[in-house]
Amino acid sequence: EHARIRLFWASAEQGMYGETRPAVFEGHLGAEVYVRPSPLPVNGDRLLRDTVVYLTCLHESGHALGLAHTAVFEDIMYSFQYGGDFNEYFGRYRRKLETRADIAKNPGMSAADRARLVEILKR
């Protein structure tokens, strides 16, 4: 209950895959992260569904920590407002996985994402 970043599973009726909203908890700035997990496999592929949910959680958590969108397709903070191939964005990560446990071995952040996060956390 004291966490400054809180994750919520959003319903399909909310019409979002992921969204981060600023919030104040006990007088401290924080964030509410909303992610809509699909209950069904994407194109019959459960690992692709897990990929979309994981990368969306990671992206939205990045916002909660202060990371902004980038125009670099390799970054987790990439925004599709710049275009880009949705299927390839998630597919390149999915191709690294044989099982759900492989997600723990493949963090999904680029070196640039990590460098920006380190700079934010130093402040």
Segments from the language model and where they lie:
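The catalytic-center signature of Zn2+-dependent metalloproteases
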Residues: 47-122
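Metzincin-family zinc-dependent endopeptidase catalytic domain
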Residues: 1-72, 82
